[in-house]
């Protein structure tokens, strides 16, 4: 189940609130310019599927997002527990960073913990199949796929180069809950 846990930066062990209803999650994130919605991920995709398979299966949804929001680049991150670089990728994504452009993720299989650091609060969003999250440019965040990843996410960007992270050098991500496998 998708959820949102909101923490004050001074209390990483205890969330101020935990939300599980789509409307509550979307409203809370929307106050900070973050869009959260549910789309139907109808095509059967399994973690480990190739980028070409995923893009082909979801071409209609991808084209709609690219047209409506001006995204110019699409890629797919598709990982399962057998991926040879899972530890390196997890470590990279767990470092707090930001992008110079919006980042959109549409989860078409599995789950991941997308965590946002906004002012004095941390918003941990458990994203699952059918979840669409759009994070505005400049928002500090990190992503945890767990020790044994099992997810497929379509990522869209305004930048033709795709995923370009500007790491903050902060160690805040290590103080907050991780995705439990």
UniProtKB/Swiss-Prot annotation:
Broad enzyme group: oxidoreductase
Cofactor(s) needed by this chain: Fe(2+); Ni(2+)
Amino acids binding Fe(2+): 97, 99, 103, 141
Catalysed conversion reaction: 1,2-dihydroxy-5-(methylsulfanyl)pent-1-en-3-one + O2 = 3-(methylsulfanyl)propanoate + CO + formate + 2 H(+); 1,2-dihydroxy-5-(methylsulfanyl)pent-1-en-3-one + O2 = 4-methylsulfanyl-2-oxobutanoate + formate + 2 H(+)
GO molecular function: acireductone dioxygenase (Ni2+-requiring) activity; acireductone dioxygenase [iron(II)-requiring] activity; iron ion binding; nickel cation binding
Residues under site feature: May play a role in transmitting local conformational changes: 102
Record note on cofactor: Binds 1 Fe(2+) cation per monomer.
UniProt site (May play a role in metal incorporation in vivo): 96
Residue positions binding Ni(2+): 97, 99, 103, 141
Pathway(s) this gene product operates in, as recorded in its UniProt entry: Amino-acid biosynthesis; L-methionine biosynthesis via salvage pathway; L-methionine from S-methyl-5-thio-alpha-D-ribose 1-phosphate: step 5/6
Top-level taxon: Bacteria
Keyword terms of this UniProt record: Amino-acid biosynthesis, Dioxygenase, Iron, Metal-binding, Methionine biosynthesis, Nickel, Oxidoreductase
EC number: 1.13.11.54, 1.13.11.53
Protein family (similarity comment): Belongs to the acireductone dioxygenase (ARD) family.
Assembly notes: Monomer.
Biological role: Catalyzes 2 different reactions between oxygen and the acireductone 1,2-dihydroxy-3-keto-5-methylthiopentene (DHK-MTPene) depending upon the metal bound in the active site. Fe-containing acireductone dioxygenase (Fe-ARD) produces formate and 2-keto-4-methylthiobutyrate (KMTB), the alpha-ketoacid precursor of methionine in the methionine recycle pathway. Ni-containing acireductone dioxygenase (Ni-ARD) produces methylthiopropionate, carbon monoxide and formate, and does not lie on the methionine recycle pathway.
Cited HAMAP family: Salvage_MtnD (MF_01682)
Protein name, entry field: Acireductone dioxygenase
């Amino acid at each position: 189940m998708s959820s949102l846990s909101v923490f004050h930066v001074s209390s990483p062990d205890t969330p101020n609130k935990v939300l599980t209803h789509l409307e509550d999650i979307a409203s809370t994130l929307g106050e900070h310019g973050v869009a959260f919605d549910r789309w139907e991920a109808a095509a059967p995709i399994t973690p480990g599927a190739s980028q070409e398979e995923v893009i082909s299966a979801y071409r209609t949804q991808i084209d709609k997002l690219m047209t409506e929001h001006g995204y110019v680049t699409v890629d797919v991150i598709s990982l399962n527990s057998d991926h040879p670089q899972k530890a390196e990728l997890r470590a990279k994504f767990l470092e707090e960073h930001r992008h110079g452009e919006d980042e959109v993720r549409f989860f078409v299989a599995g789950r991941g913990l997308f965590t946002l650091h906004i002012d004095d609060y941390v918003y941990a969003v458990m994203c699952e199949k059918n979840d669409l999250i759009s994070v505005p440019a400049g928002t500090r965040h990190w992503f945890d796929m767990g020790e044994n990843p099992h997810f497929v996410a379509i990522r869209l960007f305004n930048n033709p180069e795709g995923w370009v992270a500007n790491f903050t050098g902060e160690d805040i991500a290590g103080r907050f809950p991780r995705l439990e496998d």
